[in-house]
Amino acid sequence: IDFNLGKEPADTFTRNQHPVLRADFILANPPFNISDWWHGSLEGDPRWLYGDPPQGNANYAWLQHMLHHLGPSGRAGIVLANGSMSSSQNNEGQIRAAMVDADVVEVMIALPGQLFFNTQIPACLWFLAKKKTARPGEVLFIDARKLGRMISRVQAELTDEIIDRIAATVAAWRGEAGDYADQPGYCRSVALAEIAGHGHVLTPGRYVGAEAVEGDDEAFADKMRSLTEKLGEQVAKGAALDAL
């Protein structure tokens, strides 16, 4: 694997080791929500094309830093905290709106909780594209929050099968392989105008809707009576246990 770590270990914001790099692909898992990143020299930096990031949170600095280093047809995949999809504090909402309106946000994926050993903060994936080759004016939303499998009391994982499913969904949406179709509760392709109508919030759950469930023919009154009886039984059992 070819690599270039730069001339020296340094702060990538204030002492950028790759100022002229314009990459075809970028993958990044920057630290979430870091608050001590700002330096006065970053005011008006050319990387902040969509707005100056808040000085107390680097999430939108990372997003714009990656976009700045993409080539004309480059793509980036970035892991960030879930809050980045909806935060409106200190200019973040305005930056996100500018990015959406510029059509550089391609795919948003909400991940299951407890994927990381070192943090319980829920995470998401941002897929950015300098110039979309397929589906301009749309964003693909995937809600994978319920697709994790617990491998211990405190740790979840995405199985290879689920990863393949997500990858196939993105590929189909891009027109690379297979046919794409919206799936309630899982994925939906959304026009930029609809996203703007939601205040440019990028949380997938807001757009994909609820998963379709099989209906049944049981009348509501009968179902309510059955549930009430079960509740009474559980309350009685609880009282009996409390009396022991």
Q: Which residue stretches match the model-derived regions?
A:
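A conserved structural/catalytic subdomain of Rossmann-like adenosyl-cofactor enzymes
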Residues: T12-L244
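Conserved SAM-binding strand-loop segment of SAM-dependent methyltransferases
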Residues: D2-A10
